[in-house]
Amino acid sequence: MSKFYEWISPDSDVLELEKTGLKPPPMYKVVLNNDDYTPMEFVVEVLDKFFSMDLEKATQLMLTVHYEGKAVCGVFTAEVAETKVAQVNIYSRDNEHPLLCTMEQA
């Protein structure tokens, strides 16, 4: 087996694996903001449709939005967060509701 490695001389340049040091992507919170006009049922519908929440979790989060003014719907990479914010805002406008979804750095 030593014959297999004979072609590598001890003083030759040998490539070593370099650690790339990949960092995880920055994460963003998708936030639903309260308003005085959007029906609670519509907020629950949005949470179900765009964040795949079951009825109980969506209702709890809707109540948090209602009583605390805003709530985090989820934490995502920038591209996913931007997409969800746009989807919710477009869907809200299409249904003539002023519901506002925003994103904040986590």
Swiss-Prot record:
Pfam families: ClpS (PF02617). It comes from the Bacteria. One of its GO terms (biological process) is protein catabolic process. InterPro entries: ClpS, ClpS_core, Ribosomal_bL12_C/ClpS-like. PANTHER family: ATP-DEPENDENT CLP PROTEASE ADAPTER PROTEIN CLPS, ATP-DEPENDENT CLP PROTEASE ADAPTER PROTEIN CLPS1, CHLOROPLASTIC. Binds to the N-terminal domain of the chaperone ClpA. Belongs to the ClpS family. HAMAP family: ClpS (MF_00302). Involved in the modulation of the specificity of the ClpAP-mediated ATP-dependent protein degradation. This is ATP-dependent Clp protease adapter protein ClpS.
